[in-house]
Every structure is written in structure tokens, then in C-alpha cells.
């Protein structure tokens, strides 16, 4: 495959995902005007929205990074394609107010989670096969071990949203526990995982800017508070949920602020945005920070549902 073809394929993947997101906005606005059948469907749609944001992040990130790797392994074409399918399924689910799962959407999201898990295994293998094996140097400069985890999370959020739609409106259950509690634990674990990846990459960057400490402090605290709110006894539930909700809003804002910081990092490189074709690959990854926002918004939906379980 020629370099021109690779460029066209990468740009087409990102453009298709962006166009799909814009096209779906009309349906999402119309859906908000209509009362949802139940809070469990509203929570499912919120998880679909979080899944969509994560899938868009993976689509852009994997297309860029695998292009930078010249698609050396043909399996490197799979993540952008699967992420695009997951994005479409998540956006469709976000606009769907029916209290019933969609088989195709569910299958796509399960496929996305499986692809992300397989990608994580491939990336870990890439790290360990290098001279020195599992070392800090290889974790810093080998295939990013945590990157495919975002696709796992996108698929998991989307699949859980489909499963939740099949539950009864009153007292829905997931994994043998109240649905709100289960959703909060899943979102909290996702926040902790993404914070760990940010910690590794920001440590590699020597925390050159004070703002680089924000994702490794605010985000894990948000994940811990969300888990605490899910597990808190009834007498402490209201206070725990209120504080967790406030912190998750801060985390959601941090994700979009991080996008701005990363864009500024690209602009500060030699040539700035005029040299975008080089600096986008050499600078901080633009698609990474919104994953915090996606999981924080999912966590807020879980807390709203958790309130009905008291």
C-alpha cells in the first residue's frame, strides 16, 4: 500500500466518524424532547453517549498512531474500522428511546470490546518482545499498552447499555446487583484505568507543565469517589453521591480542557499548526483527554440511577 493510500485511508476514517457524529445530532436533539420510558433507558442512553465519545477517541487515535507505524501489521487496520462501527452503534443507541436491546448494536459493541482486549494483548507482546522485556523504557517507547483499553471501555459501556434496556423499569439488575451500583463501579474502574495510562505518559513527559498533574490526581479521585458512592451504606449515600457528582463534573470538564492543552502542545512545537502533518504525530495525542469526559458523564448517569435504589 502506497503512502498516499495510507493517508487517504486515515483521513477518510476520521472524516467518516466526524460526519457520523454531526449527522446524529439531529436525532439526539429530538430524543431529548420526548420523555424516556424509564430512568434505566435514560441511563442506557447516557452510557451510549459515553461509548460514542470513547469510540471517536479510539478512531482518531488508532488511525493516526497506526498510520505512523505504517500499518506494518495488517491487523492494525482493524481498530479504526471496529471503532467506526462502535461509534455508529453507540450514536444509534443514544438516539433510541425504546426499552429493548438492539441485537446488531449489542453484537458490534461486544466485538469492539473483544478487539480492544486483543489489541491490549498485542501491545503488551510488542513491549515484552523488545530487548529488556517489561521495562520502563519499553513501556514508554513501545506500543502504548493502555491505548486499546479505551476500545474495551467503549464496547463495555455500549454492551451494558443494551443489556440494561432489557431490564424492568423498576429495580433493574446488572451482574446480580442493582443496576445503578453496577454502572457506577464499571465507570469508576474505567476512570482509574485511564488515569493510570495518563500517569505513565505524563511521567514520560517529566510533567513539564503543572497541568500535567491534573489527570493523575483529579481523575483517580473521581473514580474512587464514584466507587465509594456505589458501595456506601444508606445513611451516607446522599452525601457520598453529592460529593462524587461534583467531582465528576470537574472530571468531565478536565477532559475537554485537556484537549485544549494538547492542542496548545501541538501549536508550541516547531512550525506549530502550519506543520500539522508532523506535529500531530510528534505532539501530545489530541484524542486522549476526552476519554475522561466520556467516563465521567457515564458515572453521572450511574449516580442518577443509584439515587432511585435507596
Q: Which residues does each predicted region cover?
A:
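Short amphipathic, positively biased membrane-proximal segments
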Residues: 1-310
Amino acid at each position: 500500500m502506497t503512502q498516499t493510500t495510507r493517508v487517504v485511508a486515515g483521513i477518510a476514517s476520521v472524516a467518516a466518524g466526524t460526519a457520523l457524529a454531526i449527522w446524529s445530532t439531529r436525532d439526539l436533539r429530538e430524543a431529548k424532547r420526548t420523555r424516556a420510558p424509564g430512568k434505566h433507558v435514560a441511563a442506557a442512553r447516557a452510557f451510549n453517549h459515553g461509548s460514542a465519545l470513547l469510540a471517536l477517541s479510539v478512531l482518531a487515535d488508532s488511525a493516526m498512531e497506526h498510520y505512523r507505524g505504517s500499518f506494518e501489521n495488517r491487523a492494525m487496520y482493524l481498530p479504526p474500522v471496529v471503532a467506526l462501527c462502535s461509534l455508529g452503534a453507540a450514536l444509534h443507541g443514544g438516539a433510541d428511546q425504546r426499552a429493548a436491546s438492539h441485537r446488531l448494536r449489542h453484537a458490534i459493541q461486544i466485538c469492539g470490546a473483544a478487539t480492544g482486549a486483543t489489541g491490549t494483548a498485542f501491545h503488551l507482546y510488542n513491549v515484552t518482545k523488545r530487548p529488556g522485556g517489561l521495562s520502563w523504557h519499553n513501556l514508554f517507547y513501545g506500543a502504548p499498552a493502555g491505548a486499546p483499553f479505551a476500545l474495551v471501555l467503549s464496547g463495555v459501556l455500549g454492551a451494558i447499555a443494551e443489556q440494561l434496556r432489557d431490564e424492568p423499569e423498576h429495580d433493574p439488575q446488572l451482574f446480580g446487583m442493582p443496576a445503578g451500583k453496577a454502572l457506577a463501579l464499571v465507570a469508576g474502574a474505567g476512570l482509574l484505568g485511564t488515569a493510570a495510562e495518563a500517569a505513565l505518559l505524563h511521567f514520560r513527559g517529566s510533567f513539564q507543565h503543572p497541568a500535567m498533574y491534573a489527570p493523575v490526581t483529579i481523575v483517580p479521585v473521581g473514580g474512587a469517589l464514584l466507587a465509594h458512592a456505589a458501595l456506601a451504606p444508606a445513611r451516607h449515600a446522599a452525601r457520598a453521591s453529592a460529593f462524587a457528582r461534583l467531582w465528576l463534573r470537574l472530571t468531565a470538564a478536565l477532559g475537554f480542557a485537556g484537549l485544549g492543552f494538547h492542542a496548545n502542545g501541538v501549536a508550541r512545537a516547531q512550525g506549530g499548526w502550519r506543520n500539522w502533518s508532523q506535529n500531530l504525530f510528534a505532539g501530545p495525542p489530541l484524542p486522549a483527554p476526552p476519554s475522561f469526559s466520556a467516563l465521567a458523564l457515564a458515572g453521572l448517569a450511574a449516580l442518577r440511577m443509584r439515587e432511585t435504589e435507596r
